[in-house]
């Protein structure tokens, strides 16, 4: 056993351990007071780097959620505005339907048109004023807008909102055969004209659609009325709707005289004696209408005294009479019927509720006037034109000049909006087209909103998991650290006692010197 005075090894060891224990106590107190296991890089260098990366990712995901919520807010603003526009369109259509009956006077139709014009102004006002943070939402400028929805660059969602102003929606394409089709009967007493098969090109942008053959004749269940039914049966595939008008009009007022051997559509009416000028007593009209259920043709007089024959079901109209009948009916007989062995087929109108062209071909389709050599009255209109006058181009393309031999675009228009029966029909088509366009825009916005909601749910879940991973690395385990602090506290107390004992041992040297 040796005793040294200059170097107290035991005391030095006790001191060194005590210093380390105090350092550990300080570290424990720092962790317990901050709640963090890593307070500085020295605590866990690699762990700190990972935790910092996770914290950055979590904060970025939080901002991404806020971005997505901003996008949803913008979409909801536009959606509610468009919902109001759709309500306006519903009201306009209801007023157009109200105007589309001849019980309305011209004055009442003008009142309805005035209401519609006000509604149109509000529709455009909504389109021009709906905005978010200074950005116009419904003007068409909100296109391919990107929203960052991830923690890393180029993780975006794109959103576009189409224009909803009246000049950008409600497009309809109208085409009407320029000539009211005229066919040659097999014989003066026959009724067969031809068979027509139509082929509509690129109805869906790519494919064509061929319709079944339809017989064009003066018999029931044939003619362009039957052809229109076939077209409308497949309107969902074609995107095209058909209307027709089969009318024969005298070229001049009815003159006095006797009509002998009158035959309409193969049904013999016989002789109508002593017809008065302008058929003032109605005997000619009554004679023709007495067999209208057999002929499918109804007669009336217009305000000029000309006789009008209208096909009730769209079959062709043929008229045969002897001798001076042409003088009675009006010189030159009926518009479009130049002889007793001819029949008027009528005029077919095709309407498409978008701006695409109507491309049609087929077998014998020239017999119904749809031939480039004959010419087709055609135009594209939009909802904005509802605020003004429907000009001659719209009137002709919509078949408004049905009682004319040729749908001449130089003829007069049909007035403003619903101020005419035909105009009211056009307004209904425009509104239907506008509704379809707005519903498509809303549907696209709804899809984006669903995507954003799903993204928010996913990001929120990811953010929670990232925060949990960061917490596992950065946050302190209070139970373990409290136990560690208690251990170090006890060690500090025992170390102080040990250091005191180590210093006391050196006093034994004095005993040796006594």
Curated annotation (Swiss-Prot):
List UniProt keywords, sorted A-Z.
Bacterial flagellum, Secreted, Virulence
What does the record give under GO molecular function?
A: structural molecule activity
- The protein depicted here goes by the name Flagellin B
Function in brief: Flagellin is the subunit protein which polymerizes to form the filaments of bacterial flagella. Important for motility and virulence.
Q: Does the keyword Isomerase apply?
A: no
Source organism's superkingdom? Bacteria
User: Where is it found, in Gene Ontology cellular component terms?
Assistant: bacterial-type flagellum; extracellular region
How is this protein organized at the quaternary level? Heteromer of FlaA and FlaB. FlaB is located proximal to the hook while the remainder of the filament is composed of the predominant FlaA.
- Entries under Pfam families matching the protein: Flagellin_C (PF00700), Flagellin_IN (PF07196), Flagellin_N (PF00669)
Similarity comment: Belongs to the bacterial flagellin family.
Q: Where in the cell is it found?
A: Secreted; Bacterial flagellum
What lineage is this protein's organism placed in?
A: Bacteria, Pseudomonadati, Campylobacterota, Epsilonproteobacteria, Campylobacterales
Gene3D superfamilies in the cross-refs:
3.30.70.2120, f41 fragment of flagellin, N-terminal domain (1.20.1330.10), Flagellar export chaperone, C-terminal domain (6.10.10.10)
Principal location? secreted
